[in-house]
């Protein structure tokens, strides 16, 4: 699940604690992966460290990776993975050099072959709703695809039937306070 907390969560301990309580509820319901968009903000680092300490048994990652600093921050706090919004082979190589899982986000399908040539085994397709009629996942048996873009928990079964191994629950499924 991709959680996009409201900006005031980073500066307000009460809001952080409420957010952590909400996250705990969905973890108790079976959530295995959680990612929050990277922010160039010390308070983001603090919140992510709190998540890492409070929930050591789930996979926690960062999204919207844009530069080497965002990867360095994710490495520094011990995140399990990060996701790029767009394909960037320089960032992908930097992540690989640092032995860190960076999942490419492909907005343009013409980048798919390039990502595969870099031996990407997990690829995020964004926005998935625009790509579903033209992308046959059965042609890529060794790749794990993740669907993203305006999806909710209610979309899970549909995208699983299309061959996606996971979907990212975004703003449609989590408005910053409530889960659908």
Per-region residue spans from a language model:
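Short low-complexity, flexible loop/linker segments enriched in glycine and/or proline
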Residues: 49-51, 97-100, 118-121, 139-141
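Short, flexible coil/turn micro-motifs enriched in small/turn-prone residues
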Residues: 56-58, 144, 165
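Conserved N-terminal beta1-alpha1 strand-loop-helix module at the mouth
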Residues: 1-78, 94-99, 153-154, 161, ...
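Catalytic cores of alpha/beta
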Residues: 67-80, 110-119, 132-135, 141, ...
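Short beta-strand segments
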Residues: 2-4, 146-148, 170
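Glycine-rich phosphate-binding active-site loops on the catalytic face of alpha/beta enzymes
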Residues: 81-91, 125-133, 162-180
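Catalytic beta/alpha-barrel core
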Residues: 32-41, 58-66, 71, 78-88, ...
């Amino acid at each position: 699940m991709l959680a996009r907390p409201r900006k005031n969560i980073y500066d307000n301990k009460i809001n952080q604690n409420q957010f952590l309580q909400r996250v705990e509820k969905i973890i108790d319901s079976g959530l295995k992966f959680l990612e929050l968009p990277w922010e160039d903000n010390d308070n983001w680092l603090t919140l992510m460290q709190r998540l890492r300490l409070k929930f050591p048994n789930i996979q926690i990652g960062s999204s919207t990776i844009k530069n080497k600093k965002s990867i360095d921050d994710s490495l520094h706090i011990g995140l399990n993975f990060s996701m790029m919004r767009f394909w960037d082979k320089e960032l992908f190589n930097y992540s690989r050099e640092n032995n860190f899982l960076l999942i490419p986000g492909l907005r343009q399908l013409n980048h798919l072959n390039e990502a595969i040539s870099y031996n990407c085994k997990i690829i995020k397709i964004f926005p998935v709703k625009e790509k579903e009629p033209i992308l046959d996942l059965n042609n890529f048996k060794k790749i794990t695809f993740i669907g993203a873009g305006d999806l909710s928990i209610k979309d899970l079964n549909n995208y699983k039937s299309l061959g996606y191994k996971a979907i990212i629950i975004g703003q449609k499924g989590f408005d910053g306070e409530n889960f659908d």
